[in-house]
Amino acid sequence: MFFQTTIVAALAFLAVATPLALRTDSRCNTESVKCCNKSEDAETFKKSASAALIPIKIGDITGKVYSECSPIVGLIGGSSCSAQTVCCDNAKFNGLVNIGCTPINVAL
């Protein structure tokens, strides 16, 4: 009986003492999470009037373009997110038009 208790206690000690591995696969922090009310393909965006608002070569844009973005923290004040929650860790042109964001699945 004493031997079993010692083994269980030793295993419990090892489980508690083992350090947790730091996950570095996702760098999206709370400041990078945005709620974007509009999302469109880059090709559609290139044809829109909004494309004239950003000072980069339009041909360089690929993937999705998100607009009307606000921080998730702002949702507490009564805003609503009707399209897509994104991580804008490496985003360009924060707010009006966001390029370089990654969609994330967050239940709000």
From Swiss-Prot:
Concerning InterPro entries, the annotation shows: Hydrophobin, Hydrophobin_CS
**What triggers production of this protein?**
Expressed throughout the culture in cell wall extracts, but increased when the aerial development becomes prominent. Expression is impaired by carbon source limitation.
Q: Effect of knocking it out? A: Alters the cell surface structure and mycelial hydrophobicity. Exhibits relatively slower aerial mycelia formation on a liquid medium and leads to slower growth under stress conditions involving SDS and H(2)O(2). Leads to a marked delay in lignin degradation on beech wood sawdust medium, while the production of lignin-modifying enzymes is not reduced.
Residue positions with a glycan: N37
Keyword Transmembrane included in the entry's annotation:
no
Which terms in the Gene Ontology molecular function aspect does this entry carry? structural constituent of cell wall
Q: Which cysteines are joined by disulfide bonds?
A: C28-C87, C35-C81, C36-C69, C88-C101
The residue range of the signal peptide is 1-17
Q: Keywords of this protein's UniProt record, alphabetized?
A: Cell wall, Disulfide bond, Glycoprotein, Secreted, Signal
How is this gene product used in biotechnology? Answer: Vmh3 can be efficiently used in surface modification applications such as antifouling agents, in modifications of biomaterials used as implants, in designing drug delivery systems for water-insoluble drugs, and also in food foams.
Q: Where is it located?
A: Secreted; Secreted, Cell wall
GO cellular component assignments = extracellular region; fungal-type cell wall
Where's it mainly located?
secreted
Q: Name one Pfam family in it.
A: Hydrophobin
Q: What do we know about how this protein assembles, alone or with others?
A: Self-assembles to form functional amyloid fibrils called rodlets. Self-assembly into fibrillar rodlets occurs spontaneously at hydrophobic:hydrophilic interfaces and the rodlets further associate laterally to form amphipathic monolayers.
As for what it does, the entry says: Aerial growth, conidiation, and dispersal of filamentous fungi in the environment rely upon a capability of their secreting small amphipathic proteins called hydrophobins (HPBs) with low sequence identity. Class I can self-assemble into an outermost layer of rodlet bundles on aerial cell surfaces, conferring cellular hydrophobicity that supports fungal growth, development and dispersal; whereas Class II form highly ordered films at water-air interfaces through intermolecular interactions but contribute nothing to the rodlet structure.
Similarity comment: Belongs to the fungal hydrophobin family.
Q: What is this protein called?
A: Class I hydrophobin 3
Q: State which gene encodes it.
A: vhm33
